[in-house]
Amino acid sequence: MRIILFSGKGGVGKTTISAATGYKLSQLGKKVIVVSLDPAHSLADSFDVPEEERRKAKGLPIKINENLEIQEIDIQEEIERYWGEVYRFIELLFHTTGLHEILADELAILPGMEEITSLLYVNKYYREGNHDVLILDLPPTGESIRFVSMPTVMKWYMKKIFKTERLIMKVARPTVGRMTDVPLPDEEYFKALETFYERLKGVDEILINPDITSIRIVSNPEKMVLKESQRAFLYFLLFGVNVDAVIVNKVIPEEVIQQENCSFLEKWLNIQKKYVKEIESYFSPVPVFKVPLLEEEVVGLERLEKLAQLIYGDEPPDKIFHKEIPYKIEQLDGKYVIRIKAPGVKKESISLVKGEDEIVVRVGNFKAHVMLPRKLRNLEPERAKVEKDEILIFMS
């Protein structure tokens, strides 16, 4: 099974591109399910699914054609279903503090619950093996990053905290429970967490396997969107998830300027050209697909088919377009070292230019942009060297 995740800032066109990718694959005979994890669902809108049919689905898959299903996950319903006792305990805890019942119900959905619940579907569909391709339309970038980090966080909690917390509560419940009216988690709460974790087991290996999972970053040729895409790229690399393509959406076609002779559009086109060039430079060697701004909104199968053709041409959308990790950050002898893939680079002078949040590396004709995590932004590049097919930068 192939799993393709689409991530990006809100409004860049993730949902439409997810829908177009899924539809194209279904036309190629692949069994596909496209799942929207974005709370502001618009996946069914892309396929022009009637409102009544969406309501009937109640968060379950909707069949589009023989090979394609779509699903808009109802997070509230899923959390109540899968978290069970955990959700009810947190709701009770908030209610005990004096919060209104409705507000307590809303606040009982803690940060991370939505992402972990969504991961259940990744594991479920992968294990069942009823589809050739699973496409995930992720929430905006921040939540996407949390989504890929959650398996690691959950594993750490279960290994380091869970058993101790369970034991403490078992000992404390009989005595502390008589001294306070604040509810304490009972054994059912811990059993629910344990069962939940069992359902999630193995999903982290699925997400970091480049032969199975790819993330495609959807961006627009604008400064703020580009910056967010760069940060997302860095974090996906740090979590070991393969980014196999960047899709630059809503690029103004040059022929429109020639036909309309509009100075307003021409100015925007020149701005976009600048950022497209930056995107190609920054994300290299990850392939960048440029998608023109269309003259009408992309709704319905015919327009989705047209969009997919503009993105992928004759390439199958489930192809792994790139698998090499461009760079990684590790510790060596107490220092942080940035390893950059640079096949064919010879041992010659290395130029390093450090900006506020990145390092630009030049060696001959080779150029790479390395986004720095917060921990490294106050450090300076001490030295650099070429070792086999890598450039090593030592930070201090």
UniProtKB/Swiss-Prot annotation:
Keywords: Arsenical resistance, ATP-binding, Nucleotide-binding, Translocase. One of its GO terms (molecular function) is ATP binding. InterPro entries: Anion-transp_ATPase-like_dom, ArsA_HSP20-like, ATPase_ArsA/GET3, HSP20-like_chaperone, P-loop_NTPase. The keyword Nucleotidyltransferase does not apply. It catalyses: arsenite(in) + ATP + H2O = arsenite(out) + ADP + phosphate + H(+). It is an enzyme of class 7 (translocase). Its EC number is 7.3.2.7. Coiled coil: none annotated. The keyword Isomerase does not apply. ATP binds at G8, K9, G10, G11, V12, G13, K14, T15. Anion-transporting ATPase. Catalyzes the extrusion of arsenite. Belongs to the arsA ATPase family. This is Putative arsenical pump-driving ATPase 1. The lineage of its organism: Bacteria, Pseudomonadati, Aquificota, Aquificia, Aquificales.
